Protein backbone atom coordinates (compact mmCIF):
# COMPACT_ATOMS: atom_id res chain seq x y z
CA UNK A 1 0.00 0.00 0.00
CA UNK A 2 1.24 3.48 -0.89
CA UNK A 3 0.11 6.85 0.46
CA UNK A 4 0.85 10.44 -0.53
CA UNK A 5 0.43 13.41 1.80
CA UNK A 6 -0.32 17.02 0.87
CA UNK A 7 2.97 18.25 2.32
CA UNK A 8 4.75 16.07 -0.24
CA UNK A 9 3.28 18.19 -3.01
CA UNK A 10 5.23 21.25 -4.09
CA UNK A 11 3.47 24.48 -5.10
CA UNK A 12 2.46 24.67 -8.73
CA UNK A 13 4.13 27.21 -11.06
CA UNK A 14 2.79 30.75 -10.76
CA UNK A 15 1.71 31.19 -14.39
CA UNK A 16 -1.74 32.60 -15.26
CA UNK A 17 -3.32 29.20 -15.87
CA UNK A 18 -2.24 27.80 -12.51
CA UNK A 19 -3.30 31.00 -10.79
CA UNK A 20 -6.74 30.60 -12.36
CA UNK A 21 -6.98 27.02 -11.08
CA UNK A 22 -5.84 28.17 -7.63
CA UNK A 23 -8.61 30.80 -7.55
CA UNK A 24 -11.16 28.21 -8.62
CA UNK A 25 -10.02 25.86 -5.86
CA UNK A 26 -10.40 28.57 -3.24
CA UNK A 27 -13.93 29.27 -4.47
CA UNK A 28 -15.08 25.64 -4.71
CA UNK A 29 -13.38 24.38 -1.56
CA UNK A 30 -14.20 27.44 0.53
CA UNK A 31 -17.50 28.33 2.14
CA UNK A 32 -18.82 30.20 -0.89
CA UNK A 33 -21.78 28.50 -2.58
CA UNK A 34 -21.49 28.23 -6.37
CA UNK A 35 -24.31 27.51 -8.81
CA UNK A 36 -21.92 26.30 -11.50
CA UNK A 37 -18.29 25.90 -12.46
CA UNK A 38 -16.06 28.94 -11.77
CA UNK A 39 -14.30 30.75 -14.65
CA UNK A 40 -11.58 28.73 -16.34
CA UNK A 41 -12.74 25.36 -14.99
CA UNK A 42 -14.40 22.83 -17.27
CA UNK A 43 -17.89 21.78 -16.14
CA UNK A 44 -16.84 18.10 -15.94
CA UNK A 45 -13.97 19.04 -13.59
CA UNK A 46 -16.28 21.05 -11.36
CA UNK A 47 -18.73 18.13 -11.25
CA UNK A 48 -15.94 15.77 -10.19
CA UNK A 49 -14.81 18.12 -7.42
CA UNK A 50 -18.43 18.37 -6.27
CA UNK A 51 -18.78 14.57 -6.16
CA UNK A 52 -15.65 14.32 -4.03
CA UNK A 53 -16.93 16.97 -1.63
CA UNK A 54 -20.34 15.27 -1.45
CA UNK A 55 -18.56 12.05 -0.47
CA UNK A 56 -17.08 13.85 2.53
CA UNK A 57 -13.55 14.16 1.12
CA UNK A 58 -11.26 17.14 1.70
CA UNK A 59 -8.48 18.33 -0.64
CA UNK A 60 -5.84 18.27 2.10
CA UNK A 61 -6.39 14.60 2.98
CA UNK A 62 -3.69 11.97 2.79
CA UNK A 63 -4.32 9.79 -0.28
CA UNK A 64 -4.05 6.02 0.11
CA UNK A 65 -3.59 3.91 -3.03
CA UNK A 66 -5.24 0.58 -2.25
CA UNK A 67 -4.59 -2.49 -4.40
CA UNK A 68 -6.34 -5.81 -4.91
CA UNK A 69 -5.01 -8.93 -3.24
CA UNK A 70 -3.42 -11.67 -5.39
CA UNK A 71 -6.60 -13.78 -5.74
CA UNK A 72 -8.88 -10.85 -6.62
CA UNK A 73 -6.25 -9.49 -9.01
CA UNK A 74 -5.97 -12.81 -10.83
CA UNK A 75 -9.75 -13.02 -11.19
CA UNK A 76 -9.94 -9.44 -12.47
CA UNK A 77 -7.24 -9.91 -15.09
CA UNK A 78 -8.63 -13.27 -16.19
CA UNK A 79 -12.01 -11.63 -16.70
CA UNK A 80 -10.46 -8.99 -18.97
CA UNK A 81 -8.10 -11.14 -21.03
CA UNK A 82 -9.79 -10.25 -24.34
CA UNK A 83 -9.49 -6.54 -23.53
CA UNK A 84 -5.84 -6.95 -22.55
CA UNK A 85 -5.02 -8.75 -25.79
CA UNK A 86 -6.64 -5.98 -27.81
CA UNK A 87 -5.04 -3.17 -25.80
CA UNK A 88 -1.41 -4.26 -25.46
CA UNK A 89 -0.26 -3.62 -29.06
CA UNK A 90 -2.01 -0.23 -29.10
CA UNK A 91 -0.48 0.76 -25.77
CA UNK A 92 2.98 -0.17 -27.08
CA UNK A 93 2.47 2.19 -30.03
CA UNK A 94 1.18 4.90 -27.70
CA UNK A 95 4.26 4.64 -25.46
CA UNK A 96 6.44 5.01 -28.55
CA UNK A 97 4.84 8.42 -29.09
CA UNK A 98 4.99 9.75 -25.51
CA UNK A 99 7.75 7.82 -23.73
CA UNK A 100 10.45 10.40 -24.50
CA UNK A 101 8.34 12.96 -22.59
CA UNK A 102 8.29 10.65 -19.53
CA UNK A 103 4.61 9.81 -19.89
CA UNK A 104 3.40 6.23 -19.41
CA UNK A 105 0.13 4.44 -20.11
CA UNK A 106 -2.42 2.69 -17.89
CA UNK A 107 -5.38 0.51 -18.80
CA UNK A 108 -8.18 0.13 -16.24
CA UNK A 109 -11.43 -1.77 -15.96
CA UNK A 110 -14.80 -0.03 -15.60
CA UNK A 111 -14.25 0.38 -11.84
CA UNK A 112 -10.89 2.13 -12.24
CA UNK A 113 -8.69 -0.84 -11.29
CA UNK A 114 -5.42 -0.89 -13.23
CA UNK A 115 -5.10 -3.91 -15.55
CA UNK A 116 -1.94 -3.04 -17.50
CA UNK A 117 0.98 -0.60 -17.26
CA UNK A 118 3.34 0.25 -20.13
CA UNK A 119 6.04 2.86 -20.59
CA UNK A 120 9.12 4.34 -18.90
CA UNK A 121 8.75 4.20 -15.11
CA UNK A 122 10.92 5.80 -12.43
CA UNK A 123 10.75 2.93 -9.96
CA UNK A 124 12.50 4.95 -7.24
CA UNK A 125 9.78 7.63 -7.34
CA UNK A 126 7.03 6.83 -4.83
CA UNK A 127 4.57 8.90 -6.88
CA UNK A 128 5.11 6.55 -9.82
CA UNK A 129 5.09 3.46 -7.62
CA UNK A 130 1.77 4.53 -6.11
CA UNK A 131 -0.19 4.44 -9.37
CA UNK A 132 1.81 2.39 -11.90
CA UNK A 133 0.85 -0.99 -10.42
CA UNK A 134 -1.50 -3.62 -11.77
CA UNK A 135 -4.40 -3.99 -9.33
CA UNK A 136 -4.31 -0.50 -7.79
CA UNK A 137 -7.64 1.31 -7.40
CA UNK A 138 -7.52 4.67 -9.22
CA UNK A 139 -11.27 5.30 -9.17
CA UNK A 140 -12.72 8.66 -8.20
CA UNK A 141 -14.00 7.11 -4.98
CA UNK A 142 -10.50 5.91 -4.17
CA UNK A 143 -8.16 8.74 -5.18
CA UNK A 144 -10.40 11.67 -6.10
CA UNK A 145 -10.43 13.56 -9.38
CA UNK A 146 -8.13 12.01 -11.98
CA UNK A 147 -8.39 11.43 -15.71
CA UNK A 148 -9.34 7.84 -14.90
CA UNK A 149 -12.28 8.57 -12.64
CA UNK A 150 -13.43 11.52 -14.76
CA UNK A 151 -13.36 9.62 -18.07
CA UNK A 152 -15.37 6.79 -16.52
CA UNK A 153 -17.88 9.13 -14.86
CA UNK A 154 -18.30 11.52 -17.81
CA UNK A 155 -18.05 8.88 -20.58
CA UNK A 156 -15.74 11.12 -22.59
CA UNK A 157 -12.09 12.13 -23.04
CA UNK A 158 -10.46 14.43 -20.50
CA UNK A 159 -7.18 16.21 -19.78
CA UNK A 160 -6.14 16.95 -16.19
CA UNK A 161 -3.05 18.91 -15.13
CA UNK A 162 -1.49 19.23 -11.69
CA UNK A 163 -3.71 21.27 -9.31
CA UNK A 164 -6.86 20.32 -11.22
CA UNK A 165 -6.70 17.04 -9.28
CA UNK A 166 -8.99 17.14 -6.27
CA UNK A 167 -6.39 16.09 -3.70
CA UNK A 168 -3.41 18.39 -3.15
CA UNK A 169 -1.20 15.32 -2.78
CA UNK A 170 -1.91 14.44 -6.43
CA UNK A 171 -0.81 17.72 -7.97
CA UNK A 172 2.40 16.23 -9.33
CA UNK A 173 0.41 14.28 -11.92
CA UNK A 174 -0.73 15.26 -15.41
CA UNK A 175 -3.00 12.82 -17.21
CA UNK A 176 -5.20 12.30 -20.24
CA UNK A 177 -7.88 9.66 -20.47
CA UNK A 178 -10.60 8.24 -22.70
CA UNK A 179 -13.26 5.61 -21.96
CA UNK A 180 -13.37 2.24 -23.71
CA UNK A 181 -16.63 0.71 -24.96
CA UNK A 182 -17.17 -2.90 -25.90
CA UNK A 183 -18.83 -4.06 -29.13
CA UNK A 184 -22.19 -4.00 -27.33
CA UNK A 185 -21.70 -0.38 -26.23
CA UNK A 186 -21.07 -1.14 -22.56
CA UNK A 187 -18.19 0.55 -20.72
CA UNK A 188 -15.22 -1.82 -20.37
CA UNK A 189 -12.76 0.60 -18.78
CA UNK A 190 -10.50 3.43 -19.89
CA UNK A 191 -7.08 4.23 -21.33
CA UNK A 192 -4.87 6.70 -19.46
CA UNK A 193 -1.66 8.60 -20.26
CA UNK A 194 0.10 9.93 -17.15
CA UNK A 195 3.29 11.81 -16.33
CA UNK A 196 4.85 13.06 -13.09
CA UNK A 197 6.18 16.64 -12.98
CA UNK A 198 5.89 16.88 -16.76
CA UNK A 199 5.01 19.79 -19.07
CA UNK A 200 1.35 20.32 -19.83
CA UNK A 201 0.34 18.51 -23.03
CA UNK A 202 -3.46 18.79 -23.47
CA UNK A 203 -3.13 17.37 -26.99
CA UNK A 204 -2.58 13.99 -25.33
CA UNK A 205 -6.34 13.86 -24.74
CA UNK A 206 -6.77 13.39 -28.50
CA UNK A 207 -4.07 10.71 -28.55
CA UNK A 208 -5.80 8.86 -25.70
CA UNK A 209 -9.11 9.02 -27.58
CA UNK A 210 -7.53 7.84 -30.83
CA UNK A 211 -5.88 4.88 -29.08
CA UNK A 212 -9.08 4.01 -27.20
CA UNK A 213 -10.93 3.87 -30.53
CA UNK A 214 -8.19 1.65 -31.97
CA UNK A 215 -8.62 -0.78 -29.06
CA UNK A 216 -12.39 -0.81 -29.58
CA UNK A 217 -11.87 -1.64 -33.27
CA UNK A 218 -9.55 -4.53 -32.38
CA UNK A 219 -12.17 -5.88 -29.97
CA UNK A 220 -14.84 -5.69 -32.67
CA UNK A 221 -12.73 -7.37 -35.35
CA UNK A 222 -11.99 -10.23 -32.93
CA UNK A 223 -15.71 -11.14 -32.77
CA UNK A 224 -16.97 -14.04 -34.90
CA UNK A 225 -18.72 -12.37 -37.84
CA UNK A 226 -19.88 -13.13 -41.36
CA UNK A 227 -19.87 -9.55 -42.65
CA UNK A 228 -17.97 -6.44 -41.59
CA UNK A 229 -19.46 -3.11 -42.69
CA UNK A 230 -17.10 -0.13 -42.88
CA UNK A 231 -19.34 2.94 -42.53
CA UNK A 232 -19.00 6.66 -43.17
CA UNK A 233 -20.88 9.61 -44.59
CA UNK A 234 -20.71 9.95 -48.39
CA UNK A 235 -17.30 11.33 -49.32
CA UNK A 236 -15.67 10.17 -46.09
CA UNK A 237 -12.79 7.66 -46.06
CA UNK A 238 -13.51 3.93 -45.91
CA UNK A 239 -11.20 1.10 -44.95
CA UNK A 240 -9.16 3.45 -42.78
CA UNK A 241 -8.82 4.41 -39.12
CA UNK A 242 -11.65 6.50 -37.76
CA UNK A 243 -14.54 4.83 -39.60
CA UNK A 244 -17.66 3.16 -38.27
CA UNK A 245 -17.53 -0.63 -38.02
CA UNK A 246 -20.59 -2.89 -37.81
CA UNK A 247 -20.14 -6.67 -37.49
CA UNK A 248 -22.97 -8.98 -38.62
CA UNK A 249 -23.16 -12.67 -37.72
CA UNK A 250 -24.00 -15.64 -39.95
CA UNK A 251 -27.76 -15.12 -39.52
CA UNK A 252 -27.73 -11.39 -40.20
CA UNK A 253 -27.88 -10.28 -36.57
CA UNK A 254 -25.71 -7.43 -35.34
CA UNK A 255 -22.75 -8.98 -33.51
CA UNK A 256 -21.30 -5.65 -32.42
CA UNK A 257 -20.32 -2.15 -33.48
CA UNK A 258 -17.78 0.49 -32.61
CA UNK A 259 -18.57 3.90 -31.14
CA UNK A 260 -18.75 5.75 -34.46
CA UNK A 261 -21.04 3.12 -36.00
CA UNK A 262 -23.44 3.49 -33.07
CA UNK A 263 -23.51 7.24 -33.77
CA UNK A 264 -23.98 6.82 -37.53
CA UNK A 265 -26.62 4.08 -37.19
CA UNK A 266 -28.60 4.63 -33.97
CA UNK A 267 -29.86 1.34 -32.61
CA UNK A 268 -33.40 0.98 -31.21
CA UNK A 269 -33.89 0.16 -27.56
CA UNK A 270 -34.19 -3.57 -26.99
CA UNK A 271 -34.15 -6.00 -24.12
CA UNK A 272 -30.71 -7.24 -23.02
CA UNK A 273 -29.76 -10.36 -24.96
CA UNK A 274 -32.46 -9.81 -27.59
CA UNK A 275 -30.92 -10.16 -31.08
CA UNK A 276 -31.11 -7.21 -33.45
CA UNK A 277 -31.22 -8.01 -37.17
CA UNK A 278 -29.33 -5.71 -39.52
CA UNK A 279 -32.53 -5.25 -41.56
CA UNK A 280 -33.96 -3.35 -38.57
CA UNK A 281 -31.17 -0.77 -38.99
CA UNK A 282 -30.62 -0.69 -42.74
CA UNK A 283 -33.36 -0.06 -45.31
CA UNK A 284 -32.16 -2.79 -47.65
CA UNK A 285 -32.36 -6.60 -47.68
CA UNK A 286 -29.69 -8.56 -45.86
CA UNK A 287 -29.32 -10.65 -49.02
CA UNK A 288 -28.13 -7.53 -50.88
CA UNK A 289 -25.35 -7.06 -48.31
CA UNK A 290 -24.27 -10.69 -48.69
CA UNK A 291 -24.25 -10.43 -52.49
CA UNK A 292 -22.23 -7.21 -52.40
CA UNK A 293 -19.66 -8.73 -50.02
CA UNK A 294 -19.23 -11.71 -52.37
CA UNK A 295 -19.03 -9.79 -55.61
CA UNK A 296 -17.68 -6.29 -54.84
CA UNK A 297 -16.06 -6.26 -51.35
CA UNK A 298 -13.78 -3.33 -52.25
CA UNK A 299 -16.43 -1.21 -53.97
CA UNK A 300 -18.36 1.35 -51.87
CA UNK A 301 -22.09 0.73 -51.48
CA UNK A 302 -24.76 3.37 -50.89
CA UNK A 303 -26.44 2.34 -47.66
CA UNK A 304 -29.96 3.67 -46.96
CA UNK A 305 -31.17 4.02 -43.37
CA UNK A 306 -34.79 3.89 -42.25
CA UNK A 307 -34.51 7.55 -41.26
CA UNK A 308 -34.06 8.48 -44.93
CA UNK A 309 -30.38 9.31 -44.51
CA UNK A 310 -27.77 7.52 -46.58
CA UNK A 311 -24.30 6.32 -45.69
CA UNK A 312 -21.60 4.76 -47.78
CA UNK A 313 -20.08 1.42 -46.85
CA UNK A 314 -17.59 -1.24 -47.73
CA UNK A 315 -19.19 -4.64 -47.08
CA UNK A 316 -16.54 -7.30 -46.62
CA UNK A 317 -16.83 -11.00 -45.77
CA UNK A 318 -15.68 -12.15 -42.35
CA UNK A 319 -14.33 -15.47 -41.09
CA UNK A 320 -17.80 -16.86 -40.28
CA UNK A 321 -19.75 -18.43 -43.18
CA UNK A 322 -23.22 -17.07 -43.93
CA UNK A 323 -26.13 -19.33 -42.89
CA UNK A 324 -27.80 -20.17 -46.20
CA UNK A 325 -30.90 -21.47 -44.42
CA UNK A 326 -31.53 -18.01 -42.96
CA UNK A 327 -30.45 -16.36 -46.21
CA UNK A 328 -33.08 -18.28 -48.23
CA UNK A 329 -35.68 -17.50 -45.58
CA UNK A 330 -35.01 -13.77 -46.05
CA UNK A 331 -35.09 -14.13 -49.83
CA UNK A 332 -38.61 -15.61 -49.69
CA UNK A 333 -39.99 -13.43 -46.89
Regions found by a protein language model. Give the residues of each.
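Conserved small/polar residues in nucleotide/adenosyl-binding loops
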Residues: 325-332
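Sensor-regulatory modules in signal-transduction proteins
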Residues: 180-182, 305, 318-320
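Sensory modules in modular signal-transduction proteins
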Residues: 87-106, 221-265
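Short beta-strand-to-loop transition segments that serve as allosteric relay/switch motifs
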Residues: 190-199, 318-319
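A short beta-strand signature within small-molecule sensing/ligand-binding domains used
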Residues: 170-178, 309-313
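Amphipathic alpha-helical "output/dimerization" segments
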Residues: 202-214
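PAS-family sensory domains
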Residues: 44, 54, 114-149, 207-209, ...
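Regulatory sensory and allosteric helical modules in signal-transduction proteins
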Residues: 66-100, 104-105, 109-163
Amino acid sequence: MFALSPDAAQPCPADPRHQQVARARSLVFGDQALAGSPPGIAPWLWRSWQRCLAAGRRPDERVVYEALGPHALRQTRDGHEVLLQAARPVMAQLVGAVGAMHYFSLLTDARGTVLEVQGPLERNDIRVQAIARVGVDLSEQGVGTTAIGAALAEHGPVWLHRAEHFFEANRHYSCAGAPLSGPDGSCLGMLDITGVDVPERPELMHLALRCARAIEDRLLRALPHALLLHLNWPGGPLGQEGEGLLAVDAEGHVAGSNTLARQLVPQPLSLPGQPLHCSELLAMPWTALVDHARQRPNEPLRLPLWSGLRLQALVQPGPQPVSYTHLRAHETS
